[in-house]
Amino acid sequence: MAGVLCPTEEDRSSRAALRMLPPQPCPDESGAYRRMSGPTLSQVQEEPAAEPPQPPASAAEDDVRKRGYLRKQKHGHKRYFVLRSQSHLGPARLEYYDNEKKFRSGQRSGCHPKRVIPLYLCFTVSRRADAKNKHLVALYTKDEYFAMAAENEQEQDGWYQALSELINESKGACLDTEELEENYGTLRPGTVFKEVWQVNVKPRGLGQAKNLSGVYRLCLSSKAVHLVKLNSDVACVHLLLMNIRRCGHSENYFFIEVGRSSSTGAGELWMQVDDCVVAQHMHETFLDTMKALKAYSEFRPRSKSQSSCTNPISFITTRRYLGNLPPSQTGLQRRARTESMVGTPPSAKNNSFRFRTSSEGEGTMTRPFRSVTGSLSHLNTARINLGKQEGAGRYVRAPFNSGYQSRSASLPVSHFPSATSPISVCSSSGHGSASETLTRPSSSSVCGSPSDGGFISSDEYGSSPGDLRYFRVRSNTPDSLGNTPPIQEENTLSDYMSMSTHSQPDSRDDYMEADKCFRKRTYSLTKHTNSASKQKSQTAISLGEDSEEINKQFAFAESPKLKDSSLVDDYSNGVIDSVCNQSRSKASDDGYMPMMPSNLYDSDYLPMAPKTVSAPKQINRCPSQADSKGYMMMFPINSSPVKNVFGGAATKSNLEKLSNGGYMDMSYGNSTKQIHDSNLNNNSRGLSSYFSLPRSFKSLTKQTTDQNEYVPMSSPGKLLHLGAENGVDVCKDGAVHDIAKIELKSSSSILDQQVKRPNKLTLGIRGSNTIPRMFDHSAPAEPTSPGEYINIDFSDKASSTPYSLSADGSPSSLGSSCDHRQSPLSDYMSVDIDVQSPKATAEQSNSLTDISLYACTVVSRMQPNAEYAKLPCGTACVSKTDNIMDDYTTMTFNMAMTPPRSFASETENGTKVDSPSSIVNRLCIGELTSLNSGFSLPNPLPEPIAGPKVIRADSQGRRRHSSETFASSSTVTTSSSCFTESGKRHSSASFDNVWLKPDENSCEQENKMSRHCSTGFQNGLNYISLSMHNGVCEPTSPDCHQHQNGSRNLESGGYVSIDFTRCDCLKCPTSRKD
């Protein structure tokens, strides 16, 4: 007997080797499964000729785990099911036969089962119920759903437990849901889910928006839900349970509403199932699973206040970290939109895991920590070993060359170079959880955008900057959210800024000594030593958007720390280029910029140093710009060496000037000598905020030094006669420079630049590139800044020269007063009405003195260069010179019917002085006939286009004050042919360039003003040059100004010139002489 059994045992061993190969089932035409051809069990059984005698039934049934009758769900047919475990006969599988007889006979005769389902291909097994069957056991594969109905619940549980165990064993290395969610949606065959439903996603809501319609497997795990398409191993939709706002069912439909933090965005998913019982079961299962989230320490129960997704789900924690600055003072670090890494609370599996603070970006910690869904990940190591050398240090700066950028106002930009999609925190009022009594209810939510600035709202903390409440932040990625208190790590804080004031460099904390290698937080300027080390700043000061020439030019200012190591390192300037490398050998930086007045160079005050319009070059630092009280003076700008508009090259003095153009020049006096005055730093600059008051310039206009740096709004023409009497230099050292070399350079020297409408006001005295000129070689450039002040200055001092621009006049006679006040830098519109000498009074009584076209006298002007027009007006109603100042005049248009009234005022000498309002009482548009023959420029410019031109200023500019508007009278009629409808090309005239060219010797037209000439007469003329004459000048009149180089070539770019004459058309006395 033994000899017979031995060969049988050897044969069984060889067949067992073939049976170990897993069978590969495939459906046939009828939908049933059959064995595929190959070296499998089916091939052995299909060769009965070579089949040895069958073993006993006990030997064939040793791998059967469970067997019995069950009904099929679809048709209710009863079948005999056999559950086999993995053995030498084959892998774990579920088979069913027509009946038990066929099963037993098949073991002897080799009868095939009706169907074989390998368990390693199954997703999971679940217990279900529907309208027909209350006890269902369902198996799910990637392409099929198979369910069996049991007779009772005990039988259902028995099959469910047996199938679950075999499915777990058949997978080999069992994958839990946490490992699955680490791969973020990647499914492996045999993955076990808590529940799986086969649903039909309807094209409604997210199904239509995300193209998710069709048959899917809805796989539910303990923390997430997946939508897996048939015959696919990868979940196309991965949703966290905490992102689900609500769920429900309606008849045979089940729907899920997710929030905006989900991977699909906010919306609803509608799924159709077999019947309403299945939908109800799905609803109940989802609710039970979501309630079970509170078992996990990183989640908290959802409340009604959080169901609308206005507040993020916070972590349950009672840990408080005292002594930390809130993120409102340090800014929120920006990170990539796709970054989904967040830590679990301290009660998690690994004690090294911790919260992620709101001030940490990607690249904060070097340790791995598990995400909400259990994913293990490593962050960047940009800040490795930060602060370890500082035992008791309070703050740590970002290391140099670590890819960091920063904003000057403690607004960090990014903590890693690859951050291309910053986030911004938008806070809204909301309600937090009542279970957290130590923290303020937080309602901030993070909404990312590739273009936002990444700034944080500070309403999370209350009014105190030292509030110790921490900040809750929620990312827009599904698995990255948290309640984030600041955390001390290695006894220090990362990237927090000290808000304490240090006025002296030696009063810094000791921890700052170890921070010398770290980078400054504010924009400090150094010499341009290495262009490769510069980084482009997002908050760099930019010029006008349309200025093509200026955008090509940059400025580099020398940091004060390069000159003196005792200076504070945070002395900062804003320039076009970004931060350069700082000198590490100098005093270290405390990172704080005090906003209080302090001593010179002893504070971190931010001086708004102007930038240049010249080519990039290294320049010396301008002298001290702050007085003893700590206020920074708006120092006068000196233009860069640009090409002279009149053909001459720039002088040497211009080359040596500080090229700081571009910032608003608020300086007073002649700035030419500020470079050449060796005692300039020793001069007192004791100005205070008093001089920023509106009428405080009156005390400054009588001084002759350039120490007072407020702009007096006096006539630019007053300085004209100083060129002959006092010289062009107003500095104390008395050095004289040639007028033609210094003052002939007007702002029209940038005619070749296509200056358009920038975003800020620039009032440079020389080299200005923002002020248009009427007399360009090309078309007039658009004005750029809405100037809105009109200066009307009165002076009662007697003039030593008459005010006529006659042929034998000299440049020195082009003044308006004898007080020799310095001219401001590029005044706006100045109407200067002075008292004439008795000689002039006798010659012309109770009439307007001639007000000439002083905007054309660029050669003779010492300080201004015809940046804006001026109107020096001399009054003739004075019988004796006195010292009474009348500081206001009334400019009234079209008062021809009103006789002049004499407003006599007694001086201390008994002399009556008529009020200027009685003198300047009737103004009308006159004729631009001729100019002074004594003035000629080297290169006469071509005549501009004759015709009105109204140029609108920037719509974002300030609105004009009501006192700055000239109201047009209703009696004004249209007369001049040059006032056409072309003046309507701009709806509002903030800058009015009006050029009148009526017919010569036309006395009737010049006395009338066109109603349609410009809307500026109704809405306010902001920049206008009024050249007033006291009579109709005929070409043969001796007092008339003859054309020499053209009536427009003398103006180097002032605004429009309008001749005003008396409405009674009085002619100039021919007897007036110099």
Swiss-Prot record:
Disulfide bond residue pairs: none
Region (Disordered): 1-64, 326-370, 426-461, 475-510, 801-821
Domain PH: 63-168
UniProt-listed InterPro entries: IRS, IRS_PTB, PH-like_dom_sf, PH_domain
Motif YXXM motif 9 mapped to chain: 888-891
Ranges annotated as biased composition (Polar residues): 347-361, 475-504
Record flagged with keyword Zinc: no
Placement of sequence motif YXXM motif 3: 496-499
A single BP term in Gene Ontology: insulin receptor signaling pathway
A GO CC term assigned to this protein in UniProt: plasma membrane
Chain positions of motif YXXM motif 5: 605-608
CDD domains: PH_IRS (cd01257), PTB_IRS (cd01204)
Motif (YXXM motif 1): 33-36
Short sequence motif YXXM motif 6: positions: 631-634
Signal peptide: none
UniProt short sequence motif YXXM motif 4, positions renumbered to this chain: 592-595
Keyword Phosphoprotein: yes
Pfam families: IRS, PH
Keywords: Phosphoprotein, Repeat, Transducer
GO molecular function: insulin receptor binding; insulin-like growth factor receptor binding; phosphatidylinositol 3-kinase binding; SH2 domain binding
Membrane-spanning parts: none
Modification after translation: Phosphorylated by INSR.
Role this protein plays: Potentiates insulin signaling.
Designated name of the protein: Insulin receptor substrate 2-A
Lineage, broadest ranks: Eukaryota, Metazoa, Chordata, Craniata, Vertebrata
Gene of this entry: irs2-a
